[in-house]
Regions:
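Glycine/Thr-rich beta-alpha phosphate-binding loop at enzyme active sites
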Residues: 58-86
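Catalytic beta/alpha-barrel core
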Residues: 1-3, 16-27, 40-54, 66-76, ...
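Short acidic, glycine/proline-enriched helix-loop-strand junctions
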Residues: 40-42, 92-93, 138-139, 143
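Catalytic alpha/beta core domains of metabolic enzymes, predominantly
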Residues: 82-86, 90-96, 103
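Glycine-rich phosphate-binding active-site loops on the catalytic face of alpha/beta enzymes
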Residues: 7-29, 67-75, 113-134
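Short, hinge-like loop/turn segments at secondary-structure boundaries
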Residues: 14, 36-38, 62-65, 83-84, ...
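C-terminal helical cap(s) of enzyme catalytic domains, especially alpha/beta-barrels
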Residues: 84-88, 111, 126-143
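Catalytic cores of alpha/beta
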Residues: 2-13, 49-60, 97, 101-120, ...
Length: 143
């Protein structure tokens, strides 16, 4: 989302949450999107990739933080990003780990630091059997 009107359009067709990517927005633009989402009673998942973006998101009082483990310059994924940033996030915030999650061990490592929400795309999209892949991911994970 880059224009508040997109939020209004999204709400009109039933959306209840928007994605605000700090890497592509100024603080002013992000604030405008967050305010518009709140005005339209929508949640906002504020996505960060590093500590600088996290600091900016927190300064905007974001409460739903998505930590994207994918480096946008190299497209390399590393869940250490989530593990490193989680302790810097206040307990009042809900954290979603995004990208690079492909095993139940990954989810366990994240769960052990208090992250219990995950955005999993690529590993499931590449799976021949999505149901079996999802079951394998969740086996042994206590959420």
């Amino acid at each position: 989302m880059i224009d508040p009107y997109q939020i209004v359009q999204s709400r009109a067709i039933g959306a209840d949450c928007i994605l605000v990517i700090m890497a592509m927005l100024s603080d002013t633009a992000a604030r405008e999107l967050l305010d518009t989402a709140e005005e339209w009673t929508m949640d906002a998942l504020v996505e960060v990739h590093n500590e600088d973006e996290l600091d900016r998101a927190l300064s905007l009082d974001a409460r739903l933080i998505g930590i994207n483990n994918r480096d946008l310059k190299t497209f390399h994924t590393d869940i250490e990003t989530s593990l490193a940033l989680k302790p810097k996030i206040p307990a009042v915030c809900h954290v979603v780990a995004e990208s690079g999650l492909s095993t139940s061990a990954d989810l366990m490592r994240l769960a052990n630091v208090g992250i219990s929400s995950y955005l999993i795309g690529e590993s499931l999209m590449r799976a021949d059997d999505v149901e079996a892949a999802t079951h394998a991911l969740l086996t042994g994970v206590s959420l």
